């Protein structure tokens, strides 16, 4: 239980970091394109346009993250506080302050939240606007100074330490060893904590100097996942074999890596294939001096190629290809050694049916009254979006007017009638909603989704 609790806490932390970064990914990609095109080594070198690169990464992007983090904690006033506090850590720093913005944003939201709570019942009538504006201004000033004098220098020291440790791995040729951490963490849905918390800030820092960074590639390579799913397509059995082709296409082209996680959890030995694929891909990226100009989100092959700078396409394609081949070879060997026949047993379908039918018991609501279904995942962007789209289309074809949308765990709507989420996220989802849960292992081919669909169509026909 303690391990599950610790994992849930790390997932929640990663989800919070993601909620700060994901809404601003478009700005990061815009900066990446400007960098790839107009810096001296870019596709269309232009000294005039290249002047935009520095201010964007130094001021705009960190302030956007800080403002978003403040909004998550303290609403609109928190967003303002987060932006003010972030400027404090930016000024005087020699590096882009992404780690600092991820601290100052939520801290600013928290500070103004407590300030507003303390003043709430003490404001005389008619003075609300004056006191609210001045309280935010004074608190913002103090937070900005704190960031400038204390938090900024502390973050700079921590950032330098982490950067030097990872760069030491790079220079020693040990960078591929990061896959030993990355791959197991990813299948436990901790990928957001790693990407947004460590690699993205380091990658942006390196890209601002070199025009590209390998840090954007060490945990996002779509090759190993492609190799694993290809092996299941050819050598898997039962449901895993039938669902793998669709998952493979969406993973590689759509960039939703969560699709291969259930396959690894189902056959834990295949984590060896993922680690080996990740290590070999990273080794190839490093060998050929590969790198991307910004973080690929989602991590599809299209995003990889679009963010590959001039002169690095061979490294990108080679790293993805090698990761695919190694993962495919090892996964195929593991599946061929597997002697048990994997089929969907009647018990499994019975459990799926019972999970849905339980909602129809006395005291529970009727499925005929279901109007909104929420598909939920960590970030609310990738796997849940795909699952919601697929399920919504099935319902539309059946003529059912049921709203199906996707959400991050923290944003599950109060008026959702049913919540669908991955089984590994059950604990976190239960903490934010008491709605009936459908726990699945695959967002597009899970038997429980088929059972839910059949039950809904049967109920709505009556």
From Swiss-Prot:
Catalysis: reaction(s): D-mannitol(out) + N(pros)-phospho-L-histidyl-[protein] = D-mannitol 1-phosphate(in) + L-histidyl-[protein]
Periplasmic side: 47-50, 157-165, 294-313
Biological process according to GO: phosphoenolpyruvate-dependent sugar phosphotransferase system
Transmembrane segments: 25-46, 51-71, 135-156, 166-186, 274-293, 314-335
Broad enzyme group: transferase
InterPro entries xrefs: PTS_EIIB-like_sf, PTS_EIIB_2, PTS_EIIB_2/3, PTS_EIIB_mannitol, PTS_EIIC, PTS_EIIC_2, PTS_IIC_mtl, Sugar_PTS
Membrane topology: Multi-pass membrane protein
One Pfam family hit: PTS_IIB
EC number: 2.7.1.197
SUPFAM superfamilies noted in UniProt: PTS system IIB component-like
One of the record's GO cellular component terms: plasma membrane
UniProt remark on domains: The EIIC type-2 domain forms the PTS system translocation channel and contains the specific substrate-binding site. The PTS EIIB type-2 domain is phosphorylated by phospho-EIIA on a cysteinyl residue. Then, it transfers the phosphoryl group to the sugar substrate concomitantly with the sugar uptake processed by the PTS EIIC type-2 domain.
Full protein name: PTS system mannitol-specific cryptic EIICB component
Taxonomic placement: Bacteria, Pseudomonadati, Pseudomonadota, Gammaproteobacteria, Enterobacterales
Gene name linked to the record: cmtA
């Amino acid at each position: 239980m303690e391990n599950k609790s610790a994992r849930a806490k790390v997932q929640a932390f990663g989800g919070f970091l993601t909620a700060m970064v994901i809404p601003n990914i478009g700005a990061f990609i815009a900066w990446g394109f400007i960098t790839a095109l107009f810096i001296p080594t870019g596709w269309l070198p232009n000294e005039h346009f290249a002047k935009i690169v520095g201010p964007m990464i130094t001021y705009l992007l960190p302030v956007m993250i800080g403002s978003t983090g403040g909004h998550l904690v303290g609403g609109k006033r928190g967003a303002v506080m987060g932006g003010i506090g972030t400027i404090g850590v930016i000024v005087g720093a020699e590096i882009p302050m992404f780690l600092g913005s991820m601290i100052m944003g939520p801290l600013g939201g928290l500070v103004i939240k407590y300030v507003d709570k303390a003043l709430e019942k003490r404001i005389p009538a008619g003075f609300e606007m004056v006191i609210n504006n001045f309280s935010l201004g004074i608190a913002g000033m103090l937070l900005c100074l704190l960031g400038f004098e204390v938090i900024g220098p502390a973050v700079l020291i921590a950032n330098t330490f982490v950067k030097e440790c990872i760069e030491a791995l790079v220079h020693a040729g040990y960078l591929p060893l990061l896959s030993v951490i990355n791959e197991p963490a990813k299948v436990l849905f901790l990928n957001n904590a790693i990407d947004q918390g460590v690699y993205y800030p380091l990658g942006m820092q390196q890209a601002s100097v070199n025009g590209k960074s390998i840090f954007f590639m060490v945990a996002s390579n779509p090759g190993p996942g492609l190799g694993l799913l290809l092996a299941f397509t050819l050598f898997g059995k039962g449901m895993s074999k039938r669902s793998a082709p669709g998952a493979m296409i969406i993973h590689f082209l759509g960039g939703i890596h969560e699709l291969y996680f259930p396959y690894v959890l189902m056959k834990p030995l295949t984590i060896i294939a993922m680690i080996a694929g990740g290590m070999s891909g990273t080794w190839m990226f490093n060998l050929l001096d590969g790198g991307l100009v910004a973080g690929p989100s989602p991590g599809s092959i299209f995003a990889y190629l679009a963010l590959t700078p001039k002169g690095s396409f061979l490294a990108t394609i080679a790293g993805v290809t090698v990761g695919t081949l190694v993962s495919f070879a090892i996964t195929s060997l593991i599946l061929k050694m597997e002697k048990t026949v994997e089929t969907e047993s009647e018990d499994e379908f019975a459990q799926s049916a019972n999970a849905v039918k339980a909602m129809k018991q006395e005291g529970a609501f009727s499925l005929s009254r279901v109007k909104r279904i929420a598909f939920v995942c960590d970030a609310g962007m990738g796997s849940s979006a795909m699952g919601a789209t697929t399920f919504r289309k099935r319902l539309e074809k059946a003529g059912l007017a049921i709203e199906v949308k996707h959400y991050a765990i923290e944003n599950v709507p109060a008026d959702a009638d049913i919540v669908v989420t991955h089984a590994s996220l059950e604990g976190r989802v239960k903490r934010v909603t008491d709605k009936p849960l459908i726990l699945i292992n695959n967002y597009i081919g899970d038997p429980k989704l088929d059972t839910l669909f059949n039950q809904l169509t049967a109920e709505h026909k009556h």
